[in-house]
Structures are given as structure tokens and as C-alpha cells.
Curated annotation (Swiss-Prot):
GO terms classed as biological process: L-histidine biosynthetic process
Family assignment from sequence similarity: Belongs to the HisA/HisF family.
Entry EC number(s): 4.3.2.10
Name of this protein: Imidazole glycerol phosphate synthase subunit HisF
Keywords: Amino-acid biosynthesis, Cytoplasm, Histidine biosynthesis, Lyase
Catalysis: reaction(s): 5-[(5-phospho-1-deoxy-D-ribulos-1-ylimino)methylamino]-1-(5-phospho-beta-D-ribosyl)imidazole-4-carboxamide + L-glutamine = D-erythro-1-(imidazol-4-yl)glycerol 3-phosphate + 5-amino-1-(5-phospho-beta-D-ribosyl)imidazole-4-carboxamide + L-glutamate + H(+)
Molecular function terms, GO-annotated: imidazoleglycerol-phosphate synthase activity; lyase activity
GO cellular component, one term: cytoplasm
Top-rank taxon, per record: Bacteria
InterPro entries given in the database record: Aldolase_TIM (IPR013785), His_biosynth (IPR006062), HisF (IPR004651), IGPS_HisA/HisF (IPR050064), RibuloseP-bd_barrel (IPR011060)
Length: 256
């Protein structure tokens, strides 16, 4: 029996509001995170991902409070990321009601943190978020590099090798965002999605670039992803989660 593929709406939260940008810039307001999360829960989303994009020191308490509110009203798994740097940060988020915690920049600066987190809390609740950008030119062997700081800083790290290293350290899941595609609405970068999905034994969540339901199906069929994440197509009412599930099921994808 094939494992069901998950559909995960993503909430990018800035100072307690859901926002959506294009290529990590040009932010527009999409509403209250708890209300939006509740709507997705009612629609039958498999999980919710909540990324705190302020992640400033003053924004921390707001985030924990929002996570507490969300966890008390939403009964599907909740992954929270943004500014997670210490074991205590993870503990605080899990105590607030998160089911999984996503680590991004901190993993690049201190890979052992991922191993430490997995040992403390178990791989099942540690997600490593990877922001990848294509760095190879036409005619070259495809290569993607890891970027940090919202896609602004190159690291020199090869995305596929890095994902394998994270799995080895104990990550339970990879959240893969294509920086080239983010907010562009012309589909996932299927090359990097497939390369990483095929190289790993843990689930890969495809993110960045969904503009229609075909893109979600492509992420699974061509990108070999275990789950697909989208924001703006759901937030602004273009499509609903049930429509997405029906579309994928009609293409032979097992959904919950």
C-alpha cells in the first residue's frame, strides 16, 4: 500500500500576521494565522507549517503565544520554524503545542545541532528546512546550492549532499524550498526535488512555486516528493484543500 501523499498549507507569519511574498520579497497580508489554520483544518489539510519570518528577539513571545492559540484550536500536526537556534527553542515550541520543529539557518552554522535535537526529542519531530538555488549553467551538470538568511546568503554547500548529511545526523524530514521558484507560481523546481527525494530515505516536502493544482501533482509524480506545500494558492482562495486532494486522487496519487 503506497503511503498517502500529504498536502500542507504553509503560513509565513510576520509579527503575528500571515503574509506572502514573491521570492522572499514584496510581502502582502493574508490574515490571522489561527483563523487561517482553523480553516485549513476544517478543509482536511494533512498538516500545517508555520514559519515565523520575523524571528526577531522581540517577535519570539508573539510566536509562542500564536503557536499556543493555534495548537488549542487546530488538531492536525503543526510544524513550526523560524529562528530556531537552541534545544531550549525547540522545547519551548513543542511545549507550546508544535508537533514538529523546523531548523534552517542554525543547521548550516552548526550541523551537530540537528543531531543533538534528534537525540533529545526524536527524529520524528525534527525537520530540516533547505533553501536551494540552482547554480549550474545551461549544459552543465545540474547543481543546487544552499542559501541562508531568506535566500540572500550563499553557503557553498551542495544541496543534495547537504540533505544526505542532515538525514545522517537524524533529521526526520526535509522541507525543500526552491528559491528560484518561490512565489513565482510556475511550479516546483522538479530537478532538485527529484534529486533530493531519490537520494534520501526520509520524506521530502516540496515547496516554492505552486500556482495551480497540476504543480502539486507534478511535485509527487515527477518530483518524487512525499508531501507538497503551498501558500498563496490556498490563502487567497484560488483553490481549496479538498479540490487539491480530488485533483491528485484523479491522477492516481494516494491522498488521505
Amino acid at each position: 500500500m503506497a503511503l498517502a501523499k500529504r498536502i500542507i498549507p504553509c503560513l509565513d507569519v510576520d509579527n503575528g500576521r500571515v503574509v506572502k511574498g514573491v521570492k522572499f520579497e514584496n510581502i502582502r497580508d493574508a490574515g490571522d494565522p489561527v483563523e487561517i489554520a482553523r480553516r485549513y483544518d476544517e478543509q482536511g489539510a494533512d498538516e500545517i507549517t508555520f514559519l515565523d519570518i520575523t524571528a526577531s528577539v522581540d517577535g519570539r513571545d508573539t510566536t509562542l503565544h500564536t503557536v499556543e492559540r493555534m495548537a488549542s484550536q487546530v488538531f492536525i500536526p503543526l510544524t513550526v520554524g523560524g529562528g530556531v537556534r537552541t534545544v531550549q527553542d525547540i522545547r519551548n515550541l513543542l511545549n507550546a503545542g508544535a508537533d514538529k520543529v523546523s531548523i534552517n539557518t542554525a543547521a548550516v552554522f552548526n550541523p551537530e545541532f540537528v543531531g543533538e535535537a534528534a537525540q533529545h526529542f526524536g527524529s520524528q519531530c525534527i525537520v530540516v528546512a533547505i533553501d536551494a538555488k540552482k547554480v549550474s549553467g545551461p549544459g552543465e551538470t545540474p547543481r543546487w546550492e544552499i542559501f541562508t538568511h531568506g535566500g540572500r546568503k550563499p553557503t557553498g554547500l551542495d544541496a543534495v549532499e547537504w540533505a544526505m548529511k542532515m538525514e545522517g545526523l537524524g533529521a526526520g524530514e526535509i522541507l525543500l524550498t526552491s528559491m528560484d521558484q518561490d512565489g513565482m507560481k510556475n511550479g516546483f523546481d522538479l530537478g532538485v526535488t527529484r534529486a533530493i527525494s531519490d537520494a534520501l530515505g526520509i520524506p521530502v516536502i516540496a515547496s516554492g512555486g505552486v500556482g495551480n493544482l497540476q504543480h502539486l501533482a507534478d511535485g509527487v509524480i515527477e518530483g518524487h516528493a512525499s508531501a507538497v506545500l503551498a501558500a498563496s494558492i490556498f490563502h487567497f482562495g484560488e483553490y481549496t484543500v479538498p479540490e487539491a486532494k480530488a485533483y491528485m486522487a484523479a491522477r492516481g496519487i494516494v491522498v488521505r
